[in-house]
Amino acid sequence: MLRAGLRSSRALGLRPNVVSPGRQWRAQNARVISDTMRTFADKSSISDSRPPVLPGSASEATSEPLPPGAVATPNSAAPTPATPTSSTIPAENVPLTPPPPGVQSPGPPPPSSSPPPPAPKPKRRFFRKFFTTLFLLTTLGFGGGVYYSRINDNFHDFFTEYVPFGEDAVLYFEEQEFRKRFPLISSRASRPPRDTGEQVKIPSQSGVSWRVANENKDSTGRHTSSAKDKVKPSEAVQTPHDSKPADRVKAVEQVKSGNSPVKNSPAPPATPESKPSNVQKDPEVNEPSRAYKKIERIDPINIPNGNEPVVQELVKIMNDIIAVVNADNANARFTSTMDKAKAELNRVGAKILDMKDAALKQADEKIKSSDAEFDRAAMQLMQNFKNQQAEQEAQFRAEYEAERKRIHENYEQKLKSELDRANEVNEKTLQNNLTEQALELKRAFLADVKNRVEQEREGRLGKLSELTSTVNDLEKLTGDFNTVVDQNLKTQHLHVAVEAVRANLEKSQIPRPFTRELAALKEIASDDPVVNAAIASINPVAYQKGVPSSAALIDRFRRVASEVRKASLLPEEAGVASHASSYVLSKLLFKKKGLATGDDVESILTRTETFLEEGDLDGAAREMNGLKGWAKTLSKDWLGEVRKVLEVQQALDKPDYKV
């Protein structure tokens, strides 16, 4: 069924719905295209010399060659068949079952006209960029923190305390800077650590025992020495005086390197018969603790007035040696050597101080001799300066006298020339004054002659000039009078137009439009901005539909007033019962007259009626505008009409005032 529908639509449209790929490039099986539709292969113009291009044949993205054969174009010379092609089957001959597919001969597939697949989108390496950026920012921030920590102390404390590995990095850079600034100190061999890490052994007989110390008095005696079993110092340790100087130097070097000569020396062979007398036994429970001789330490060297760098360096070296000796408990052997070294250092320090004092004295003598020589040179220089000053003063005096004489002569010449010039100017001025006086006398004579001539002519010329001025004044007065006449005529026309509008408003019993009268008024006052503004302020509805007259407003007010009195006692949210009660009670109210006082509805209506009878629409509108609730709602339309009338009256009053 579906295939039959497709065949029928293909036969009616003279154009197959689906084109097989095999017939796409052959001219004899080309699709029938109407002449009115232009495809991609058509030329844009007849005058275009470029050959037609098929879709995909001129694409830069494909390299497939064009298929063989002619290319079918809409302007081809092949005739268009009037009937469908032979492959088209009528709708009544379409079989119910589809025909079997034909066997296609093997061959290369037809070239595809589909566009190449789009290039794959680049992968978003978000995590790599994120971690790279984070690493770079962390490195820059850490490096900047280390650099700023070496400049600012407060930031140094914060950075080393809260930032991980911050203290190690800052210490490393500070140590490198210290080594760079002091290469001699940094190149010196590092001092051996004083803490060797060995376990401390406490003798077994040291400390306090629980037994009383005088329990053994009977057996040992009163003056028994607690150190009687100890070996003499001469037997245990060799004194420094008994050794040779080479041995002592060697022992000091061994001590500095961390090896004790006592430990490295071979032990004497022990005889099996005799036991050493200094062998100590472990104390028993009831045996008191024994006291040992206190080991005296060698005090560090402290030389007074040792401010010299060389002496300080020697003192530091000796103090290091003393510290090593104290650490090895070899005080007894090196005490005399250290004392001798201290004495030598004191002597060296004193000698350096003496040399320093001698150098200071020699420097003082040199300074004094230099001062004396400088004083002599200064005195000689001052004497030379005074001599030169005297010579220059004499020279300047001579030059001054010569210059003064020259200036005096110049001033004499200038004074003489100025006097001559002044005399000449005075003479010229006198001549000019005389000439001016002569001219003035001549003018006075001519004026006198003219006056006499005028008097002789009996004032004929004066009368002619007066007549001319009078004629000019008359011309000016005539021009002003014409202007006044034109202005009065224009004012009269304007007044007539305004009165026509007012008459139309007052005489009309029903509202009538006054568009023609208003147009005439506007034409008359076309160049008057006040009148144009007044006409523009009128509501277009007012002059298109008209406004009621005063009598109509009063008549309508009376009808509105009766309704307002009925609703005067109604609240804002009143029901049917309230309306009925208000209607009944309004009949019982007394009516007021004149300008009644009060803010009730009856007083306001009475005052409004009085204002209307007097012709005061503005006052009536103000009174009615003071109503509230249902009374104001009922009088809203009447107030709107009154406002329109007031707007028109105000617009007409403005030209009236202008007039």
Curated annotation (Swiss-Prot):
Residues 150-659 are mitochondrial intermembrane. The keyword Cytoplasm does not apply. Residues 214-233, 241-253 have a biased composition (Basic and acidic residues). Residues 41-123, 187-290 are annotated as: Disordered. Signal peptide: none annotated. Residues 96-120 have a biased composition (Pro residues). GO terms for biological process: cristae formation. Its main location: mitochondrion. Residues 403-458 form a coiled coil. Residues 72-91 have a biased composition (Low complexity). PANTHER family: MICOS COMPLEX SUBUNIT MIC60, MITOFILIN. Component of the mitochondrial contact site and cristae organizing system (MICOS) complex. Belongs to the MICOS complex subunit Mic60 family. This is MICOS complex subunit mic60. It comes from Sclerotinia sclerotiorum (strain ATCC 18683 / 1980 / Ss-1). The gene is mic60.
